[in-house]
Amino acid sequence: MKPVPSTNGKVDDKVEHHNLSSSSSSSSSSSSSDTKFNISNRYGNFLQRLEALDIWPESNEQILLEPYTYLTNIPGKEIRSMMIDAFNHWLQVPRPALEIIKKIVGQLHTASLLMDDVEDDSDLRRGVPVTHKIYGIPQTINTANYVYFLAYQELTKLKPCLRSDATTDLWSLVNDELLQLHRGQGMDLYWRDSLTCPTEEEYLQMVNNKTGGLFRIAIKLMIALSPIPETPDYLPLVNLVGIIFQIRDDLLNLSSVYTKNKGFCEDLTEGKFSFPIVHSIRSDSTNHQLMNILRQKPTDIGTKAFAVSYMKDRTKSLEYTRGVLICLEEQAIEEVTRLGGNPALESIFELMHVLPSPPATDQN
């Protein structure tokens, strides 16, 4: 049917509109049918497809763990693994179970490092850029949390290794120590962010919670899996080792030894109250220079070198820290002797006894 011309020679608007509407309606109806067919075809049997969606591809696992493997591929101190082997001189845990414990502690340790670096806004870890500078903060945090749960999965592999008379709840054991670890980390962050200098006693409690936690997880798991029915109380020694390790780490951070791996005096840049810094501030409460330097979180070498010189020469805090380390090391060696001796553990103490080089004051 041809459009009817109007009296002015144009096509009647109503007729044209009717034709367009008919065409549009037909097209819309066809499109709607296609859409319904596609939805029905794709989702009509969705319940049967749900099971396949539960399958987690290995390629996805690799993507999720990439921030974690980035850090694990960079060699660390391995002090915790060495400690586990040393304590096994006494506890005699079968090798397969011991390797699982090492894996669990390694996972928890690396996950905590990922989180620490984010919370401290660090730049370097083991001499390379920290993970979140490569993968971003959201992905790094998610991976760290994921690895915590992977460690709990590994715990289930230890249950068959428990002695028949053992009543230890492995999950509660690990959970209690992770609570302690986060309590310690929480106080460390609070002091830093509120610029509150703790007492030495408060600092030591924080370290015992934070650094000692992973050491205790390892030894408590080993005690639970040891074939020896009655063992001495090794935990005081474990706690002492954790404190020695952290104080030594604090001292090293103010020396040239750490410059390559962590950056020169990184604790000052992060505004942290480490053991030498706590002693220095508490030794001379009338001088606010060091506290003000921490407030600024300096990145320049000159300011940090000045702070180190102040702690070294004015308050003698570096000498004091070395003295505390020597005193604690002697007590640890005495405790090892009391427990029957342990050549592997004594070797670790000798390694840790090597005091850092004199503090670096010129990095030019």
Swiss-Prot record:
Mg(2+) 1 binds at residues 116, 120. Geranylgeranyl pyrophosphate synthase that catalyzes the trans-addition of the three molecules of IPP onto DMAPP to form geranylgeranyl pyrophosphate. Does not show any monoterpene nor sesquiterpene synthase activity. It is an enzyme of class 2 (transferase). Its cofactor is Mg(2+). Residues 10-19 have a biased composition (Basic and acidic residues). This is Geranylgeranyl pyrophosphate synthase. One of its GO terms (biological process) is isoprenoid biosynthetic process. It comes from the Eukaryota. Keywords: Isoprene biosynthesis, Lyase, Magnesium, Metal-binding, Multifunctional enzyme, Transferase. Mg(2+) 3 binds at residue 249. Mg(2+) 2 binds at residues 116, 120. Residues 1-34 are annotated as: Disordered. Residues 21-33 have a biased composition (Low complexity). It holds the Pfam family polyprenyl_synt. InterPro entries: Isoprenoid_synthase_dom_sf, Polyprenyl_synt, Polyprenyl_synt_CS. The record marks 148 as: Important for determining product chain length. Belongs to the FPP/GGPP synthase family.
